[in-house]
């Protein structure tokens, strides 16, 4: 898994928090990355209809629908995120050994199941849920700063 899913979730939560169009540079500063990377990650979110884009001086990105309707699964699917990805599996399909010739396929099935489980879990969490969790945590830990 690369960081695109986390970056996308961060950007969407910040857009929910600010409730306005924000340019990639402002998002990048808050995410602690560069604007080019933000634009790269935001493109598939726009294609999936999760965000709206606007050009011009008041342009940037905004949520295309309420944050409570955007699940983390939708974000993962838009960004093409694979949570468990293994570049190598043991064994060799050409070996004359039951274990060696089967191990790769069995392990790949297990990893595919883990990815399905991740997506199923993410279906139950929305961008708004994360915004609320952050707000509640900030208020509990620093009530003077976040009344």
Where are these regions (language model features)?
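C-terminal regulatory/oligomerization modules of transcriptional regulators
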Residues: 91-147
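Conserved segment of winged-helix/HTH DNA-binding domains
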Residues: 67-92, 107-112
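N-terminal helix-turn-helix DNA-binding core of bacterial DNA-binding proteins
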Residues: 1-33, 52
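Basic amphipathic alpha-helical segments that dock to polyanions
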Residues: 41-48
């Amino acid at each position: 898994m690369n960081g695109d899913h986390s970056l996308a979730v961060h950007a969407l939560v910040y857009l929910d928090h600010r409730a306005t169009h924000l340019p990639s540079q402002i998002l990048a500063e808050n995410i602690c990355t560069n604007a080019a990377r933000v634009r790269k990650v935001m493109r598939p979110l726009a294609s999936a209809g999760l965000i709206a884009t606007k050009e011009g001086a008041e342009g940037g990105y905004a949520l295309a629908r309420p944050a409570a309707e955007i699940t983390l699964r939708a974000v993962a699917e838009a960004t093409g995120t694979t949570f468990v990805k293994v570049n190598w599996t043991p064994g060799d399909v050409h070996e004359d050994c039951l274990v060696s010739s089967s191990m790769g396929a069995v392990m790949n099935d297990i990893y595919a199941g883990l990815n399905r489980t991740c997506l199923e879990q993410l279906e139950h969490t929305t961008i708004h849920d994360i915004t609320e969790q952050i707000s509640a945590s900030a208020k509990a830990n620093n009530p003077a700063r976040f009344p």
